[in-house]
Amino acid sequence: LALLGVTVASAPLCSRLLGRNAGWVLALPLIIATVMAVSVYDGVHTESTSWIPSLGVDFNIRLDGLSFVFLLLVLVIGAGVLMYSTRYLHHKDSAFYFFITGFAAAMALLVTTDNLFVFYVAWEMTTLCSFFLIGNSGEKGHQPAIRTLLVTVLGGLLLLTATIIMSVSTGTMQLSEVIASDYWADNPGTLTVVAILVAGAAFTKSAQFPFQAWLPDSMVAIAPVSAYLHAAAMVKAGIYLILRYSPLFGEVAIWNILLIVCGLFTAAFGAMTAVTRDDLKELLAYSTMSQLGLLVATVGIGTDAALTAAIVHTIAHACFKAALFMSVSYTHLRAHE
């Protein structure tokens, strides 16, 4: 994470010195971080340091199987997108490299932190980076960026409310301890409320009904942004959230109902809308929405087999959809030559 922080800080300078070729240099730390993650992973790897002692906020890092999978997606696909950008961009763009590396760092923090407050901060950082990356696409991106921000900020408020309730109720800010707390067995009403809030937060991030409109709207962004944020990383933050809390909410009926019903509706709506589109990028946006709906519904089933299938399909979808977005962009460029 420190390496990624240095990468973000150095992105503007690298961009000024190297222009669009800065992507080669900025991709290197992500590759190194991937190697480091693989080398330290031993099933469950934890690190902790005090951050805000007066509030009981520690900087806890927990690398378990779920975190490891999502961290590799963030780092590997992020490195690929940065290298792709060196040939896609036609001019020096310091803002792009700063915010895309900032997004990578925020996502890496989100999937590895074991602290509720830090998780929320990382969640909002991805929202802000997405807003600036979409808005950086020119005048046509300003309104979609604002609409995307409004929807995802709503999800952030839902997550913040859930975070406060969980930390106050259990007396801890450590995510793994919150999930394992005995408090929930004696307070099913509070558990149900938190489950609804967390599901709502995930729906805004992963473009699920009734918050699905922002995803196709945001496709005005350039191809590297669509490939990374809206196919491989940002929309997967919501999937990570529901997978992470699945052990806690798996027996809550409203949780399963929300995920299955909204997920299947989104999957059907996205698929039916996709086949009516003749713009390739728009088609991919709706098909992404459909696939995310299937993932959400699968997590809602809640069995071990279903959760395993959801994780496997998350990996497959992130890889092939990122590649498709970059391929479609190349097709558009050649078609307009």
Predicted regions and their residues:
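Short phosphate-coordinating micro-motif centered on Lys-Gly-acidic
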Residues: 124
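Transmembrane helix-loop-helix hairpins at membrane boundaries of multipass inner-membrane proteins
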Residues: 8-98, 169-186, 213, 244
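C-terminal regulatory domains involved in ligand/effector binding and gene-expression control
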Residues: 1-3
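Hydrophobic transmembrane alpha-helices and their helix-loop junctions in integral membrane proteins
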Residues: 80-97, 101-119, 128-334
